[in-house]
Amino acid sequence: MGTYKYQAEIDVLIQQGLKMPEVVKPNDLKGFRFVFSSDMSKSYLPNYIMKPQRAIMNGQRKVDVGGYALSCFIEKDKAIKFYHLLAKNMRNIYKTIGDSISSGIVTNNDGNITALASNGHYNLFEFPSCDLSKTFKLEEGKLWKQ
């Protein structure tokens, strides 16, 4: 499995009874990720690092170890489709998950990934040295226009 960038935080959730998902090596898998075009610094942080209160189990929402992983898709079209599906129920989606897409290659040195979901989604559990902001590039065009 390995030690991940947010291993201490993951361990807290595991101690609370949550399970780490099955993971595999990415083997140079293409990745597409939602990003904030105006603030790339927070674009490569997991959900629970950006908003730590989301990792607190209070019975109101489902907490998942994947909150300490980076969400990616294998195809740009699938990412766009998912974004627009979410946008139907999230009025300010561009503030929550971003307004654009970046892409790059996820290598075995970056971390381990979960199995691909039917919509092409996977989570990347980063190794400590991983920094996708250095290897992923912003795609042209915005998903959300304010």
Can you say where each PLM-predicted feature lies in the sequence?
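Charged phosphate-binding loop/patch that engages nucleotide di/tri-phosphates or the phosphate backbone
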Residues: 125-146
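Polar/charged alpha-helical tracts
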Residues: 11-15, 77, 134
